[in-house]
């Protein structure tokens, strides 16, 4: 599971502040996750994640001290942009990025929990569908939702997906699942902290893309 474990997310401090530099370093390797799904149909989600990472990094690098944590970015942009906030800058980029990260988290957790289609246990459509419905569906219009339904037909078999996560190495499914669980510990905590931060700051928007 080197694709995931090589770039583990760091544990959060007690105050749940997320260091921007560390976060960007870890999250920048996640777009490759969508290559493991084996279809160009998933490329829009990958491109969206990549683009939002770039926007956040640009804001951070403009003043690393001022934007040391993700919360400092939101607070700084709120003060800077006034009534335009939160639909602006890195605040908007992180809002969409966290949804893409949530998609990955729910999908991997579903696989780790053993959720599957009993009629087709080696398919991961059930896991992908759950992740999409929880993380992204409500923010997508009718056309994008239809495109996603089409993408499901191109989803790989579970063994092919796990092998891709392992960078082509043939490993036992139990070992892959255990490494997914290890990755999810800090990753899930980080995603949850971002969602809580957005709710506390009233930065969440529900418009459809």
From Swiss-Prot:
This protein's UniProt keywords: Cytoplasm, Lipid transport, Repeat, Transport
Source species: Xenopus laevis (African clawed frog)
Family: Belongs to the GLTP family.
InterPro entries per UniProt: GLTP_sf, Glycolipid_transfer_prot_dom
Highest taxon listed in the record's lineage: Eukaryota
Segments of this protein annotated with the region 2 X 12 AA approximate tandem repeats: 45-66
Positions of Sequence repeats: 45-55, 56-66
Purpose: Accelerates the intermembrane transfer of various glycolipids. Catalyzes the transfer of various glycosphingolipids between membranes but does not catalyze the transfer of phospholipids. May be involved in the intracellular translocation of glucosylceramides.
Main location as per UniProt: cytoplasm
Cell compartments where the protein resides: Cytoplasm
Pfam family, one: GLTP
A GO biological-process term: ceramide transport
Residue sites binding beta-D-galactosyl-(1->4)-beta-D-glucosyl-(1<->1)-N-[(9Z)-octadecenoyl]-sphing-4-enine per the record: 48-55, 140, 207
Keyword Repeat on entry: yes
Record's protein name: Glycolipid transfer protein A
MF terms in GO: ceramide 1-phosphate binding; ceramide 1-phosphate transfer activity
GO CC annotations on file: cytosol; membrane
